[in-house]
Every structure is written in C-alpha cells, then in structure tokens.
C-alpha cells in the first residue's frame, strides 16, 4: 500500500531515519532504482493516494524497498511480485538472496519460478498442505506441485 506524498516519504515509512545511501540500496535490491531515476523528480515524485500514477509492478517494488528499510530479520512477501514480469521477479529474488543472506524470507507465490530456489517449499491445495520439500523433491513426489509446474512451463 502506498500513501499520498512523495516516493521518498513512502519509503521512509519503513525507516524514517534511513540515509540516502540506505534508500538507494533498498531501491536497488527491489529493482526500483532505475524507474525512480527516470522520473523527472526522482524520489521527490508526488504519488497520488495508493500510488495511482505508478504501474502495479512499480508499486510492488516500492513496497518491497520500504520493507527492506526496516532491516527485517524475517521478510514475508505475500504475492509481492505478482505484478512484475518474470525477469524482474528473478532479479529481485537474486538481490534478496545476495544482499540479505541472514534474513529469513517467507515467499507466498503462485509462480513456481518465484519459489523453486527456496530451501523448502510448502504446497497448499484448497487450504490443505499437500507437500513440503525442495523443488526437485516436490516435482518427483507431489502431484499438485507437478501439475502446477507443468501448467506454468507450457505457458512459457
């Protein structure tokens, strides 16, 4: 969720004392730095309530950057990259892995690509756990996971 005010003000909800360098680093990890830099006013760009002047993917990336400014021990991403393309999703996941190695990340996603490198994956079907394991284990042992994987691979 974004609020009226500037991009910087929205990010500072995560840490009002964040330095410009910390804000830049969080934006880099969230793959938001480039699109912010391309805006005429950059971080000083005014957002309408809910960030109406940004795309869904841009809003999600700003929310991720704001969460990163809290320097969390646990980061929960609940379908937080659903509005970004797969290449952006991949860049963000890679940056999170490399820049926050000590942070526990809980990723809730519908895209297999978003979770396949996780230490372990919990598969839910109609609210019930049907499997827990690594990507390769679940492909081999879990019918629901395999069906989701096959349907997404065929789409691509």
Protein language model features and the residues they cover:
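A short, proline-enriched helix->beta-strand linker immediately N-terminal to the Walker B motif
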Residues: 69-73, 102
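C-terminal portion of ABC ATPase nucleotide-binding domains
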Residues: 37-38, 87, 94, 116-156
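Conserved catalytic loops of ABC-family nucleotide-binding domains
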Residues: 98-109, 115
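ABC ATPase nucleotide-binding domain helical subdomain, centered on the C-loop/LSGGQ "ABC signature"
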Residues: 8-49, 102
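Helical segment within the ABC ATPase nucleotide-binding domain
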Residues: 89-101
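Short alpha-helix in the ABC ATPase nucleotide-binding domain helical subdomain
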Residues: 64-65, 109
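Catalytic Walker B motif of ABC-type/P-loop ATPase nucleotide-binding domains
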Residues: 75-79
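ABC-fold ATPase nucleotide-binding domain signature/coupling loops
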Residues: 33-62, 80, 84-87, 154-156
